[in-house]
Amino acid sequence: MGFSFKAFHVDDFGCGMPVSTDAVLLGAWANLDGADAVLDLGAGSGLLALMAAQRCKAPITAIEIDPVAASACRSNFSASPWPDRINLIEADATDAEALAGKVFTHILCNPPYFETGPLSEKPGRAQARHTGSLGFLALCKLITTHLSTEGIASLVLPVESEQAFRQALTHLGLGIRQRVEVSTVEGKAPRRLLLAVSQGEDSYQHEHLAIRDVHGCYTEAMTALTRDFYLKL
């Protein structure tokens, strides 16, 4: 079970959200240059923490509330080439004691997607996908609390969630530094956004990434972004 990458394997059995293209894109795209301490916020199976460990030398903290996902994290971290560099905290990130006193130069987060709508019948998946447990305002409060002054938080969101997320950013004095619209196929409307956030006002250029071309093959940009991770690239 799970998904094998070039440098590590992720067992995501029982996790609320399995390995996804969204998470791989985020983990490969985030600018970790100069990162001194990295947080994987809502780690799930630990994929983002593992990708960060492959890409930089910084110590990495992963926090996950779901016990099944946290168990998968432990196994995945232990089996990876970097077991001594990734620390797992099994706790609710909104609990003041969970990350007390910790500050990070980079925060990675693939947050819950749905502001409204029915919850899944599976509690783990519902928790992973629904913002009822970690809304955008709570997420942005965590970013302001635990991000260093010059730090960056990188996230992936559905396009339709952008307005609600921007409202939370503005409320807490955060701004977008980089914004990439992601389309599944060249020429199609974007479905996801890759965002880099920091303190201050918005300051970014419009960028676009297509995952596949019209023939169904990965685009050159997608291949360049993920070639260090996907086995067949």
UniProtKB/Swiss-Prot annotation:
GO biological process terms held by the UniProt record: methylation; tRNA processing
Family matches, as InterPro entries: DNA_methylase_N6_adenine_CS, SAM-dependent_MTases_sf, Small_mtfrase_dom, tRNA_Adenine-N(6)_MTase, tRNA_adenine-N6_MeTrfase
Short name of any one Pfam family annotated for the protein: MTS
EC numbers on record: 2.1.1.223
Location in the cell: Cytoplasm
Protein name: tRNA1(Val) (adenine(37)-N6)-methyltransferase
Top-level taxon of origin: Bacteria
Keyword Transcription regulation attributed: no
MF GO annotations: nucleic acid binding; tRNA (adenine-N6)-methyltransferase activity
Keyword S-adenosyl-L-methionine: yes
Cellular-component GO terms for this entry: cytoplasm
Similarity comment: Belongs to the methyltransferase superfamily. tRNA (adenine-N(6)-)-methyltransferase family.
Reaction catalysed by this enzyme: adenosine(37) in tRNA1(Val) + S-adenosyl-L-methionine = N(6)-methyladenosine(37) in tRNA1(Val) + S-adenosyl-L-homocysteine + H(+)
Alphabetical keyword list: Cytoplasm, Methyltransferase, S-adenosyl-L-methionine, Transferase, tRNA processing
